[in-house]
């Protein structure tokens, strides 16, 4: 049964709603499903005193909901759709000069605003189901709010939803009035039937459905993630369906007539089994449904920064969505919901879904911002800002597509692209194809571009077996034309035909305001060419390049392996016919394990595109170290992003910066040992590293290999500006270069704390050998240590961090005879044994009985 307006809970707050809108500019209304906010409240708005007869725009997130609500409201008024209440959708509208309430989809409002920033004649904009937070809704709200704040202080805004996160919204609408309505729903019993293996959820769903279709007496609504799942279950269930039950698919890409059939009341005493995506979560009421079966899954388009495009991802729905789905069983009577997952799984899920602005492709939205005159999301009153890095990446993509200038103003191409109801990439492809068709006299190039754009908007028309070894999109065009009568193909061709007419109309005369996106393309234009033999299939790559300039890809050494202009490696099966081509355009990519795989591509005649001026290369001087010549050589490269398309050796003088960069790259590749550090340089580094490890309080700069390699430009770079040969590099005084990193005071401390030599009593300079494994070592003959009673030490004497040297005591023949770090203990202890041996071996030398008080000497006894 259908509830009349008088029976609906929203009626209880009618006076409050009317007063709030008459007295304030902004209202937030929270009303659960079944309250009547979409089917009753809009009719009250027509009589608002504050509107003075002005128009109302009522936004709906889905086309089928917009059309149904317009029809329902018109019926309540006893009028035809298009009189007082009308609707406007993409490609379809029913409005007249008498229409005061237009039910529209969110993207339509954006286009209306772009053509009329003051919303002339409109007094109120109503955003229904705002909790869904689609990208289009966020954008439409931001533009409307911008108009309200800057141009139309009389413009009213009403946000309605079953559940509104009012905290974030109130930040942008601090003056808004908040109202809440009771809902009307019936109890829904919830049970959980999780599959034993989550990967086999479709088979489990099929088993559950088989068990209920013949026993359940009412209509059943099944929530599935995507259209592929709907088709699979529909095919598997066809043989099990009782005659009393109709099987109806319901998803966004379905023709409106078929969507209408799915939600219309069943006739002749029959029930329905509706297999739906999340399109049926809100807005739509399917009469007779008292059983919901929820897969707990959804397919969402997530923007992948690796592929620079959306990827369809299946994921678990949030709790809020699961609650909404279950509620569909209790809209008109008590019901039951079977969740195909466990209760524990439900409890672990997030409360709300992530808003689309944080995960979707931002290019279409930022293109609209550019049209609006904004160069940053922060310039508009957005409910939520996208992540900054993603936003900046998207702006740069639009600049690279030459749709925006570097100052984020619309270019000439950008203005043309804004007239097309498709992604900016595809629109750029269409306008470029039309221009090339005329300039290069290539027949039917625009037709081919329109077919490619329409194909890329849809799922692949090849089955999985065909796709395995054939990613050539040109073959899809041929199949599309040869099998044009297939239902799926027909939808693609209709869209391609629409693109074609819009493009033709754009060249003949300016498209009227609001024509793009929501007025049908002129039918007087010539029809698209669908003859595969006449289409320039070999030019697919030429067309696709305008949509994906960063995906020009050059073959690497291995067949099927390519490098793209934006620096990512991509692969296709080696058996694919395209795998041997030198250059391709990788139109669609997907992540497979650790690599990016090509789903759709086309061969690309790069050098023809360069000759025609379609692709512009940049000249880049490239230096590299030649191992055979042992020197740096230079080459002139013609590059497209990361791709080198042509290189020639050159002897021209190169900039010092490039020389330094090349040397640093080579040294990092080879390691620090590749530099010819002499003994002095090596000892310097050992002293420095020893000082850092034992005298950390001095806060000296680092001198480890990793640090020196990372900072080559600072300590070595200034001395490489005219070095071209390795022999020149080897001649550099690395000790001096390293010491130059210390200031004068640090150098003096370095000499004092970590001296290079120990000067003994006989004035001999003995090298101190530093090590990170032990204390520093010094070697000298025993005779030159007589009289030394304090072991020499290095380190900071002011900080109690001195370290005694390891003394390697030598015989007159300069052979080690003892090692000690305590001379006093040596003189008093093991010296006696050493003295005996030395007297026997070297009788001419002086071996005193009291070495601690003897005079150090270099002489033998007869010269003393």
Where on the chain are the PLM-derived regions?
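Second RecA-like catalytic domain
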Residues: 244, 249, 293, 301, ...
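Residues that form generic nucleotide/phosphate-binding pockets
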Residues: 20, 172, 208, 265, ...
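Charge-dense polyanion-binding interfaces
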Residues: 126-127, 255, 259, 432-460, ...
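Flexible, glycine/threonine-enriched loop-and-boundary segments that flank and lead into catalytic domains
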Residues: 263-264, 531-581, 733-787
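A positional "C-terminalness" feature that preferentially activates on distal terminal regions of long
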Residues: 629-864
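Solvent-exposed loop and beta-edge segments used for protein-protein assembly and interaction
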Residues: 23, 214-216, 579, 680, ...
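P-loop NTPase motor module signature
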Residues: 1-429, 509-513, 517-526, 584, ...
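A short, structural micro-pattern
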Residues: 182, 331-332, 360-361, 446, ...
